[in-house]
Amino acid sequence: MTYNELKSEENKYVMNTYGRFPIALDHGKGATLWDVEGKKYIDLASGIGVNCLGYDNPIIVNAITEQAHKIMHASNLFTTEPMVQVAKKLVEKTHLNGKVFFANSGAESNEGAIKLARKYSFDKYGEGRYKIVTLINSFHGRTVTTLKATGQDRFHNYFFPFTEGFDYAVANDFDDVRCKVDDMTCAIMMELVQGEGGVLPLDPAFVKQVEALCREKDLLLIIDEVQTGIGRTGSLFAFQQYGIRPDVVTMAKGLGGGVPIGAVLAADTCCNVLTPGTHATTFGGTPMVCAAANAVLDNVGDPKFLHEVKQKGEYLKNGILALGKDSIHGVRGMGLMLGIIVDEGKHSAYANKLIENGVLAITAGKNAVRLLPPLVISKDEALSVMAKVF
């Protein structure tokens, strides 16, 4: 079908919940995509950080195919080998000595972390200690609870009443965080690079102070690595570059390399809090998606691969800055999670212009063109187009 034919059918049958770009994607290879009209695009979005190993990668395709011939789904009333393997790899590669709960998305993973934190506190201190401090400009999901955890007022509409129990502090302002913590607080939850908020890395000194506060007050430190995790920043998880030890790490996006999976990794401080009957999901940890996740971790977890991600990120960042364009006010981020800073309100226009020139990019915050390419992208694939656009 042509784009116009597909769009007509979409308008008729699909809920209008997304502001879509005017293209219909058909297939891909590596870091390149083609639409239904045959136009070629360099992908700097990777499905919002999902397709970490690119498209038609035999590593992923073979893992999924082989597992599909065995068993695609099994109830969590039974044990399956791919699930156990993924959990073991996550625990061993993070040195948190904990355990994993599997979910289907980032929002579900964050919901699980919120439940875990509240039960941890309930078990130790009883009722009344349930509040969680998050950061202004954060994003933690689109369920009724994770929307409320999100520190952006524009998301707090329509769906009243939201889940109570969230306070918001200014990022990189430790005094404000300390002021927001009281006797009813059970956890602090943060993204180390605020993705939807504008690709804003947190200050390492601030993060260390927050960790120390959590230890002082017996609060769980929850690090939302839904977007930063699985090699995106040049380490398997961003917290490893900050030198901290979280109690809980949430993840999704790149973990499945293109198939839906999320996970809650709890350290030894709290990994036995959730028990039978307190949390569950039908599809979490199903064999086929875990087969894909195993393939991803075997490759992205390689130190050489992660070093190359850092190198590519620096090369792309420096190459963009070297263009010397007045329209570019800076580039921020870590690894291959970058934001090109432009005039406020102009980021969507630049993203559209990139698409016209055969590059897929997305936006973040009020002034960032967000780059989240497949981690396998070559160094030079995107730079040639940037000069035409900015």
Model-predicted regions and their roles:
Residues 1-390:
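Conserved N-terminal phosphate-binding loop of PLP-dependent enzymes in the Aspartate aminotransferase
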